[in-house]
């Protein structure tokens, strides 16, 4: 009688960067806390735009990085902690936004999608090669618009066209640049930390 089990070598090949550190509950908490801190720092780096309620922010790159580095479960926990802190009133969101009652809050919820997609893809090895990291980065980063626009359009009483022109079109080039950065960085990190 044979049993099917994953060999340690096969399991190691599909790990994310954070798994290289060994495993304890303290380590798990520390990784989630580090991911949350990364989100806070990167999301606070923003440029307000006068024609839209949505600022240019490194929050999406933060969510992509946290998901890719920590994996889906830890990445989601990190981003969820960041979101909960902001809803509770901690000054972690861009500008002076706290709570949930502002037009760009949907984009913050979208960070959860970004981290989940990037984390799941990284767990399957997508961050190892440029050819797989590029579509992972693009799909992950652009997923933020699903919740972002779904929240902003009704909240700000916009038409779909207005929402796209204020909450999507101005950010396409910036998100493609962020995707290019991630595509260049993560395969290199993976090759260094084998």
Role assignments for model-derived ranges:
Residues 33, 37, 41, 65, ...:
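Generic alpha-helical transmembrane segments of integral inner-membrane proteins
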Residues 3-21, 27, 41, 98-149, ...:
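Short helix-perturbing small/polar motifs within transmembrane alpha-helices
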Residues 2-76:
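Hydrophobic transmembrane alpha-helices
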Residues 44-55, 83-114:
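Interfacial aromatic-anchored transmembrane helix boundaries in multi-pass membrane proteins
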Residues 29-33, 61-65, 75-81, 104-109, ...:
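Hydrophobic alpha-helical transmembrane segments
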Residues 79-91, 110-121, 157-162, 184-194:
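Juxtamembrane/interfacial segments around transmembrane helices
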Residues 52, 125-194:
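Membrane-embedded alpha-helical hairpins and interfacial helices in multi-pass inner-membrane proteins
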Residues 66-69, 89-96, 177:
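Juxtamembrane membrane-interface segments at transmembrane alpha-helix termini
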């Amino acid at each position: 009688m044979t049993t099917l089990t994953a060999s340690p070598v096969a399991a190691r090949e599909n790990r994310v960067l954070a798994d290289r550190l060994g495993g304890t509950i303290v380590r798990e908490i520390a990784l989630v806390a580090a991911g949350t801190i990364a989100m806070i720092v990167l999301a606070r780096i923003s440029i307000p735009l006068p024609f839209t309620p949505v600022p240019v922010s490194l929050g999406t790159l933060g969510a992509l990085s946290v998901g890719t580095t920590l994996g889906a479960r830890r990445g989601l926990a990190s981003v969820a902690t960041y979101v909960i802190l902001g809803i509770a009133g901690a000054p972690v969101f861009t500008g002076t936004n706290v709570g949930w009652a502002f037009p760009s809050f949907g984009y913050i919820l979208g960070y959860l999608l970004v981290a989940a997609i990037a984390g799941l893809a990284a767990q399957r090895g997508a961050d190892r090669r440029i050819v797989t990291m590029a579509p992972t980065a693009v799909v992950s980063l652009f997923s933020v618009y699903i919740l972002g626009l779904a929240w902003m359009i009704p909240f700000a009483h916009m038409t779909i066209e207005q929402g796209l022109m204020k909450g999507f079109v101005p950010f396409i080039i910036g998100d493609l640049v962020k995707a290019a950065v991630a595509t260049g960085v993560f395969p290199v990190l993976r090759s260094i930390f084998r």
